[in-house]
Amino acid sequence: MKEQIFDIIETVSGTDEFREDLDMDLFEEGILDSMRAIMLIVELEGAFDISLPPSEMDREDWNTANKIAARVQEKKDEN
């Protein structure tokens, strides 16, 4: 599942640069911005049949690929 999440991040961001360091801050590095973050949420929700309300997503809680993968897994486990 992690690999699928990383593929989605790559598609939305247009780069695989984050794969070199899965704890890289995607916002600080300019890989994600607010618009791409919303696009990422929509893609993840569709791919994994989960709900990721932006109001529950503080930037610090999902600013790295590893944190995004953990959050998606957490939401999948809730279902």
Swiss-Prot record:
Pathway: Cell wall biogenesis; lipoteichoic acid biosynthesis. InterPro entries: ACP-like_sf, DltC, PP-bd_ACP. It is found in: Cytoplasm. GO terms for biological process: cell wall organization; lipoteichoic acid biosynthetic process. 4'-phosphopantetheine is transferred from CoA to a specific serine of apo-DCP. Residues 1-76 form the Carrier domain. GO terms for molecular function: D-alanyl carrier activity. Keywords: Cell wall biogenesis/degradation, Cytoplasm, Phosphopantetheine, Phosphoprotein. The modification O-(pantetheine 4'-phosphoryl)serine is found at S34. Belongs to the DltC family. Carrier protein involved in the D-alanylation of lipoteichoic acid (LTA). The loading of thioester-linked D-alanine onto DltC is catalyzed by D-alanine--D-alanyl carrier protein ligase DltA. The DltC-carried D-alanyl group is further transferred to cell membrane phosphatidylglycerol (PG) by forming an ester bond, probably catalyzed by DltD. D-alanylation of LTA plays an important role in modulating the properties of the cell wall in Gram-positive bacteria, influencing the net charge of the cell wall. This is D-alanyl carrier protein. It comes from Lactococcus lactis subsp. lactis (strain IL1403) (Streptococcus lactis).
